[in-house]
Curated annotation (Swiss-Prot):
Result for mutant: T333A: Minor reduction of in vitro phosphorylation by CkIIalpha
Gene that this polypeptide is encoded by: mbm
Gene knockout outcome: Lethality around pupal formation with rare escapers with a delayed eclosion time. Reduced size of neuroblasts and ganglion mother cells with no effect on cell size in wing imaginal disks. Grossly reduced mushroom bodies with degeneration of Kenyon cells.
Annotated function: Required for small ribosomal subunit biogenesis in neuroblasts. Plays a role in mushroom body development.
Any coiled-coil regions, as ranges: none
Keyword flag Metal-binding: yes
Start-end of Basic residues biased regions: 80-89, 428-447
Comp. bias (Basic and acidic residues): 67-79, 199-208
GO molecular function, a single term: zinc ion binding
Protein name: Protein mushroom body miniature
Natural source organism: Drosophila melanogaster (Fruit fly)
Length: 539
């Protein structure tokens, strides 16, 4: 390291470092502002020789970066005075990451007695790219060597090294099933599955550069099978064995008849690589590959047929007259059903039957509509044949409103029957009010008088037996007093009720110029329902 020159004078033990801790933090601030002499921390750290370790901690201990500090890291590092002074050398908040060079050179100069000015020109030797990389990467307590593999470019390079074998494996494994396809194209044309089609498309995309279209030549296939059967007889007698052998022969044969490719549209990817990779495989793998490829090879043909059918359906659906029938049943997609639906639609224009009035020529929706101009039944004409008569507009509206009110009873708070009379409570005569007030006052006074007598009786009974006669007399007096107010109050109540009833009866029946709205038995009023010349007020 660069520090080796000045360590002799400043190689302090752990005990000597502790008193410098606070001083070092002050130096940290001093250096950041451009002042400050020899920093105790920089020199103490030189004795350690563990710069990236110290840097990560010291830089992160600045005022701005205490938030992001991990407290456990502080506990793990047994060098308390690492914290000061590192931030200034790294510049900015995370100075710990500036690697070893910048900080160490600065500290060397400090150790030799130089001022801070001595390490400014040495900073110029460090390119900003290096400093930025190390600033982001050096995070934990490490010696000078470990942070380099931890830096961000290193793992990406490692990943790039690990990726190529994966891509090779991906390239090597898929082609063999693709090349097995040619002999079995005509064997199993059924079982289309969508995911296999997608797989086939992906494989074709991978090998586009080497794809060549292949002709089904049926007479050639038995010859190939004869050639391969001799090979397969040595391994096993199963029928599925010749297929992997065919793969090798087919790849050779496919390369030759490339001019015939445009005759039949069954593209099959054929590459020379599979020969070296997979000369002859086990019967199980070959059968599975052949099955999958059969399924892969044929669905495109069926999908084309399906596309044709769908196109035909779309063409049949619409005509120039733009008559579409939207039905929930799936059967309507068939052309016969479409024709029937069209015939019904053509008839429907003339034979619409209303579900409300059972009349032909309009729908139930039109039957509910009203002309907004003449308020007549819906006629669907741009120019209304019945212009509105403004002379009877108000009266017609009032008639409509009254009909609505008679049909729909509104809340009882607004509508009263014709024979209702106001409640008598609101029309009390003054005498009744005075009597009620007097009653309240008298009753309260009597209750107040009775209560102390009762207390006196209880005290007399407890103290002396001679006063029993007095108590009995008082009881008698109370009993004699109690029955008197009751009939008085009853009589007054009777009088009040009689007066109220008589007052209500004496009132003449209320007369309303118009029948109450919402009255169930409202009589017919010629003013409201006049089917004659409009009413004119006399001037």
């Amino acid at each position: 390291m660069h520090n080796s020159g000045g360590q002799s004078g400043w190689n302090l033990s752990g005990e000597e470092r502790k008193p410098f801790s606070n001083y070092g933090r002050n130096n940290q601030q001093r250096r950041s502002s451009g002042g400050g002499g020899r920093g105790s921390h920089s020199q103490n750290r030189a004795a350690n020789g563990n710069w990236p370790d110290a840097g990560s901690e010291g830089g992160q201990n600045g005022n701005a970066f205490n938030k992001f500090r991990d407290p456990q890291q502080e506990l793990d590092n047994h060098q308390p005075n690492k914290r000061g002074g590192r931030r200034n050398r790294g510049g900015g908040g995370g100075g710990g990451g500036w690697g070893g060079r910048r900080g160490n050179r600065g500290r060397d100069s400090n150790r030799r007695g130089g001022r801070n000015n001595s390490w400014q020109p040495k900073d110029q030797h460090v390119s900003p790219g290096q400093s930025n990389m190390l600033y982001f990467d050096n995070v934990g307590d490490f010696t000078e060597d470990p942070p380099l593999p931890r830096s961000s470019p290193a793992p990406s390079s490692l990943r790039q090294e690990s990726l190529p074998p994966v891509t090779f494996a991906a390239d090597l494994t898929p082609p063999p099933p693709v090349s097995v396809a040619p002999p079995d194209v005509a064997v199993t044309p059924e079982e289309p599955t969508v995911p296999l089609i997608n797989i086939k498309k992906e494989k074709e995309m991978e090998h586009k550069s080497k794809i060549k279209q292949f002709v089904k030549a049926e007479p050639k296939s038995p010859k190939k099978k004869k050639v391969n059967s001799s090979r397969s007889s040595s391994t096993s007698g199963e029928e599925s064995e010749p297929e992997p052998g065919e793969m090798v022969v087919n790849t050779k044969a496919v390369v030759v008849p490339s001019p015939k490719a445009k005759a039949i549209k069954t593209p099959v990817a054929s590459t020379p690589k599979p020969k070296a990779v997979k000369p002859v495989s086990s019967s199980d793998s070959s059968t599975s590959d052949s099955d999958t490829d059969d399924e892969q090879s044929h669905p495109p043909a069926k999908s084309k047929k399906m596309e044709k059918n769908t196109e035909e359906d779309v063409v049949c659906m619409g005509s120039q007259e733009r008559q579409f029938t939207i039905t929930d049943e799936e059967e309507s997609t068939e052309p016969e059903d479409d024709k029937k639906a069209r015939k019904q639609k053509n008839k429907g224009k003339t034979v619409d039957v209303c579900g409300i009035c059972d009349k032909k020529g309009h729908t139930s929706f039109q039957c509910q509509m009203i002309c907004r101009n003449c308020s007549g039944s819906y006629h669907g004409l741009k120019n209304c044949p019945n212009p509105p008569n403004l002379n009877i507009a108000i009266q017609s509206f009032v008639e409509f409103a009254m009909q609505q009110m008679t049909a729909f009873h509104c809340e009882q708070g607004f509508g009263f029957p014709a024979g209702t009379v106001t409640a008598p409570v609101s029309a009390k005569p003054k005498k009744d009010k005075k009597a009620s007030i007097k009653k309240i006052k008298k009753s309260s006074q009597k209750r107040m008088k009775v209560e102390p007598k009762d207390h006196d009786e209880e005290d007399d009974e407890e103290d002396d037996d001679e006063d029993e006669d007095d108590s009995s007399e008082s009881d008698d007096s109370e009993s004699s007093e109690e029955p008197h107010p009751a009939p008085v109050s009853k009589q007054k109540r009777k009088r009040g009720t009689k007066a109220s009833v008589s007052a209500a009866a004496s009132l003449p029946p209320q007369v309303f110029p118009f029948p109450l709205l919402g009255a169930p038995g409202a009589p017919f009023n010629s003013m409201m329902y006049s089917y004659r010349a409009p009413f004119n007020f006399s001037k």
